[in-house]
Amino acid sequence: MPTVMAYHDVKDKDHWLASPKREEFFGPLGVTNIRTFVDPENPTRVGLVMDVADMDALVAAMETHAAADAMAHDGVLPETLVILVEA
C-alpha cells in the first residue's frame, strides 16, 4: 500500500481543513490514514499524505466529475495539484 503525498493551492485554508469532502471522496476508494498539512509561509498552499490501497482506482477516480466537484467544493485550485507516490 503506497503512501501518497499531494499538495495544491486553495482559496480558503480554513474551509478546506474543515471540509468533510476529503473523507467522502477518498474513503470509498480505500484510502486511509489521511493527514493534512498547511504551508506556514503560504497558508493557501496545503497538502495531504495518505495510504492508498489501489493506485489505479485513485488515478481513475481523480479524472471523474465527482473529483472535480469535490475539489470545487473545497476551493482547490486544480491546476496547482501535484501528486507524489512513495518510491
PLM regions: where:
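Short S/T/G/P-rich N-terminal loop/turn motif that feeds into the first structured element of a domain
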Residues: 1-87
